[in-house]
């Protein structure tokens, strides 16, 4: 019998938790870490790797992906859609800067109700989406100086163009790792570099992550990477192939023991199928209703705290 592809994830989680290197990390929580983990997921049958050993809020993941592709870096559009995955970083910054003991719900209400407050405290800096669709572009201005252009490089649009015009290229890449702009980011990109490969009319992709939180981040990361392949394939008139995932520092947080134990006690269920309801004009015109998930029957959700 063929092993369920989700077992790769469960095995990595077990290896990290029971035998990983115990590390004191930036957050102060501590992790148990592996280095250099690879997983492969077949997308050619229409399924997507949406983790089943706990419920994943896949609509929130789609909303985040659409937000990335919009180039926005402020949490307000996410919070207005009841997506809270990025709130903790600006909330932590606000608390430290003001000393105000505000809870997350109150902070999010102010983000939604007060656009000026959101502009000041809800922005994450030049994170993922900014780099994906508006990577800074500079042109010579004379005397050895350079001028930053108003409109940057849209890596996603250029990628689609290359997939259509030169699908055998080895430069089918986009990245969020912009070294000079890292200090201004609330969190440097974890899922940082994506590369694509076309063979036999099928589009495959590799996602490289410098850092991966197996408990909370990984399920969103692989699902969104798989959805991206489906979107890119649709835009370039290709079929989906395979998702290869590569994690450098692949870890479980020390306060996620209950999550690990519970997930490892559960058996994976069949991955669901993803269909796209329409073909939008471009990568930036997709909406939540365009994504149809069928056959998702996960185990119950497991709550765990995010490390900031």
UniProtKB/Swiss-Prot annotation:
One of its GO terms (molecular function) is thymidylate synthase activity. Its main location: cytoplasm. The keyword Methyltransferase applies. The active site is at residue 190. Gene3D superfamilies: Thymidylate synthase/dCMP hydroxymethylase domain (3.30.572.10). It comes from the Bacteria. Pathway: Pyrimidine metabolism; dTTP biosynthesis. DUMP binds at residues 26, 170-171, 210-213, 221, 251-253. SUPFAM superfamilies: Thymidylate synthase/dCMP hydroxymethylase (SSF55831). Keywords: Cytoplasm, Methyltransferase, Nucleotide biosynthesis, Transferase. Its EC number is 2.1.1.45. It is found in: Cytoplasm. It catalyses: dUMP + (6R)-5,10-methylene-5,6,7,8-tetrahydrofolate = 7,8-dihydrofolate + dTMP. (6R)-5,10-methylene-5,6,7,8-tetrahydrofolate binds at residues 213, 307. GO terms for cellular component: cytosol. It holds the Pfam family Thymidylat_synt. One of its GO terms (biological process) is methylation. The keyword Ubl conjugation does not apply. Homodimer. NCBIfam families: thym_sym (TIGR03284). Belongs to the thymidylate synthase family. Bacterial-type ThyA subfamily. Catalyzes the reductive methylation of 2'-deoxyuridine-5'-monophosphate (dUMP) to 2'-deoxythymidine-5'-monophosphate (dTMP) while utilizing 5,10-methylenetetrahydrofolate (mTHF) as the methyl donor and reductant in the reaction, yielding dihydrofolate (DHF) as a by-product. This enzymatic reaction provides an intracellular de novo source of dTMP, an essential precursor for DNA biosynthesis. This is Thymidylate synthase. It comes from Rhizorhabdus wittichii (strain DSM 6014 / CCUG 31198 / JCM 15750 / NBRC 105917 / EY 4224 / RW1) (Sphingomonas wittichii). The lineage of its organism: Bacteria, Pseudomonadati, Pseudomonadota, Alphaproteobacteria, Sphingomonadales. The gene is thyA.
């Amino acid at each position: 019998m063929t092993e369920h592809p989700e077992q790769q994830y469960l095995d990595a989680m077990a290896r990290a938790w029971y035998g990983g290197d115990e590390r004191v990390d930036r957050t102060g929580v501590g992790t148990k870490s592996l280095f250099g983990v690879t997983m492969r997921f077949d997308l050619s049958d229409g399924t997507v790797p949406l983790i089943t050993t706990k419920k994943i809020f896949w609509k929130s993941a789609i909303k985040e992906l659409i937000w990335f592709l919009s180039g926005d870096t402020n949490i307000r559009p996410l919070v207005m859609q009841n997506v809270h995955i990025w709130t903790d970083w600006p909330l932590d910054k606000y608390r430290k800067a003001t000393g105000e003991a505000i809870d997350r719900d109150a902070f999010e209400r102010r983000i939604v109700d007060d656009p000026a407050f959101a502009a000041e405290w809800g922005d994450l800096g030049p994170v993922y989406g900014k780099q994906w669709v508006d990577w800074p572009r500079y042109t010579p201005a004379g005397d050895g100086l350079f001028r930053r252009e108003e409109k940057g490089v849209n890596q996603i649009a250029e990628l689609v163009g290359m997939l259509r015009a030169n699908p055998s290229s080895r430069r089918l890449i986009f990245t969020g790792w912009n070294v000079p702009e890292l200090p201004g980011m609330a969190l440097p990109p974890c899922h940082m570099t994506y590369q694509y490969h076309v063979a036999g009319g099928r589009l495959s992709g590799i996602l490289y992550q410098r850092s991966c939180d197996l408990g909370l981040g990984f399920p969103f990361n692989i699902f969104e990477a798989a959805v991206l392949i489906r979107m890119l394939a649709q835009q370039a008139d290709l079929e989906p192939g395979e998702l290869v995932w590569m994690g450098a520092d692949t870890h479980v947080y020390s306060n996620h023991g209950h999550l690990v134990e519970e997930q490892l006690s559960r058996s994976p269920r069949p991955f669901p199928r993803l269909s796209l309801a329409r073909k939008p004009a471009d990568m930036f015109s997709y909406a939540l209703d365009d994504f149809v998930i069928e056959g998702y029957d996960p185990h119950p959700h497991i709550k765990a705290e995010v490390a900031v």
